[in-house]
Amino acid sequence: MRSSSIFVAIVTCVIACGPSDAQESSPVEQKTGSLSPDKKWQYNCGEYAPGYCYPEILKAGTTERAVDLDQELSVNGPEARDAEILWAPDSKRFGFNYSPPHAHHTRFTTVAFYQLRGDKWVALRQLPDYLLRRRSDYLPKGFNPRQCVREWDELKLREWTDANTAILYAPCHGRSSDLPAAFLLTLKFDDVGNWKIIKAHQMSKKELEEEQ
């Protein structure tokens, strides 16, 4: 009789405790790529209220903070949960896609890059806002930047092709929520972290349809 009671208690605990533990885990912490390739650094977005978290880089396996992304980039609140980190293959750089403070009637997403110097992470030169609206030699001559609305500015790191080369996604959003154009920009870094856009691929109509 006693063994039957123990069995029932164990089953009850498994059913009751299992979902509770899963709900306590932060969805941001489970994102793929939060751990650097060399497994020395960890991206974390610690929840301080339901739906709110503060992003940071920790030394893996510890609570020691290496970069306070909340403090440095003013990214917090519910939009911080949508932020994303992509590590360079050698773990010496990372790109952080996030939404900084902006007016409520606008949408603004950009990327910040950091580089490891010694044992310290240093912020690199920020990419300019409204990148597609600026006159640039790398954009095709037939492209009209005026078709891109100022109320929706988006620039995201898509992937690292090697330790010094990043591919950025830069869409041009139109006034009627359409996507008249989008570009994949190739960003090249030198040893000290200076970057330069060396190529701009205008996405085809088929590629745009796949994005939408």
Task: Give the role of each language-model region.
Residues 1, 13-16, 87:
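Compositionally biased, low-complexity segments
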Residues 1-7:
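Bacterial N-terminal signal peptides that target proteins for export
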Residues 12-34, 48, 109-212:
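Acidic, small-residue rich beta-repeat scaffolds with periodic aromatic anchors
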Residues 45-49, 74-76, 100-106, 175-179:
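Short consensus segments that form the blades of beta-propeller domains
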Residues 81-119:
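Extracellular-facing segments of soluble proteins and assemblies that are Gly/Ser/Thr-biased and enriched
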